[in-house]
Amino acid sequence: MALLVWQDDLNIGIDVIDQQHRRIIEMLNHLHVAQASMQRAAVGEVIDEVVDYTMSHFAFEEELMEEAGYPFCAAHKRVHEVFIKRVSEYRMRFQAGEDISDELRTMLSRWLFNHIRGDDQAYAEQVKAHLNQFAREHQGGGWLGRTLKRFFG
């Protein structure tokens, strides 16, 4: 499988989320490189990084949706929970000695692209409108800046 390339149709129009999605794609490419170089320890590190980062990303995304009053936030959160469970199962299989790199990378790339193009695009307009309104009311970063700092340092 070749390296993944960011495509314009993956942009949802919320810069911070688009940057996080790009970072996840970079991680998937690191997984490919680690696997190709037969570095099992590096593969494990990337898997851990993907799980940890996506959990933070999901929590951030869910908070944005909740703040914006997105009506399908609970359903979107369930999709995230199922994804985390699935990836955690891959991590356990890897820790048990199984070579899951190809299977995991294929699943992650398909899931991520489909999730961004479908589920994430669905909330984007409502969240953008909320962020724009909030920015007009609270010049200087406010809630978004605090939330970014809380999740990503």
Curated annotation (Swiss-Prot):
<comment type="function">
    <text>Oxygen-binding protein. May be involved in a storage mechanism or for delivery to oxygen-requiring enzymes. The oxygen-binding site contains two iron atoms.</text>
</comment>
<dbReference type="InterPro" id="IPR023504">
    <property type="entry name" value="Bacteriohemerythrin-like"/>
</dbReference>
<feature type="binding site">
    <location>
        <position position="21"/>
    </location>
    <ligand>
        <name>Fe cation 1</name>
    </ligand>
</feature>
<keyword id="KW-0813">Transport</keyword>
<keyword id="KW-0408">Iron</keyword>
<dbReference type="InterPro" id="IPR012827">
    <property type="entry name" value="Hemerythrin_metal-bd"/>
</dbReference>
<feature type="binding site">
    <location>
        <position position="61"/>
    </location>
    <ligand>
        <name>Fe cation 2</name>
    </ligand>
</feature>
<keyword id="KW-0479">Metal-binding</keyword>
<protein>
    <recommendedName>
        <fullName>Bacteriohemerythrin</fullName>
    </recommendedName>
</protein>
<feature type="binding site">
    <location>
        <position position="76"/>
    </location>
    <ligand>
        <name>Fe cation 2</name>
    </ligand>
</feature>
<keyword id="KW-0561">Oxygen transport</keyword>
<feature type="binding site">
    <location>
        <position position="120"/>
    </location>
    <ligand>
        <name>Fe cation 1</name>
    </ligand>
</feature>
<dbReference type="Pfam" id="PF01814">
    <property type="entry name" value="Hemerythrin"/>
</dbReference>
<feature type="binding site">
    <location>
        <position position="61"/>
    </location>
    <ligand>
        <name>Fe cation 1</name>
    </ligand>
</feature>
<dbReference type="GO" id="GO:0005344">
    <property type="term" value="F:oxygen carrier activity"/>
</dbReference>
<comment type="subunit">
    <text>Monomer.</text>
</comment>
<dbReference type="InterPro" id="IPR035938">
    <property type="entry name" value="Hemerythrin-like_sf"/>
</dbReference>
<comment type="similarity">
    <text>Belongs to the hemerythrin family.</text>
</comment>
<dbReference type="GO" id="GO:0005506">
    <property type="term" value="F:iron ion binding"/>
</dbReference>
<dbReference type="InterPro" id="IPR050669">
    <property type="entry name" value="Hemerythrin"/>
</dbReference>
<feature type="binding site">
    <location>
        <position position="57"/>
    </location>
    <ligand>
        <name>Fe cation 1</name>
    </ligand>
</feature>
<dbReference type="InterPro" id="IPR016131">
    <property type="entry name" value="Haemerythrin_Fe_BS"/>
</dbReference>
<feature type="binding site">
    <location>
        <position position="115"/>
    </location>
    <ligand>
        <name>Fe cation 2</name>
    </ligand>
</feature>
<feature type="binding site">
    <location>
        <position position="80"/>
    </location>
    <ligand>
        <name>Fe cation 2</name>
    </ligand>
</feature>
<dbReference type="InterPro" id="IPR012312">
    <property type="entry name" value="Hemerythrin-like"/>
</dbReference>
<feature type="binding site">
    <location>
        <position position="120"/>
    </location>
    <ligand>
        <name>Fe cation 2</name>
    </ligand>
</feature>
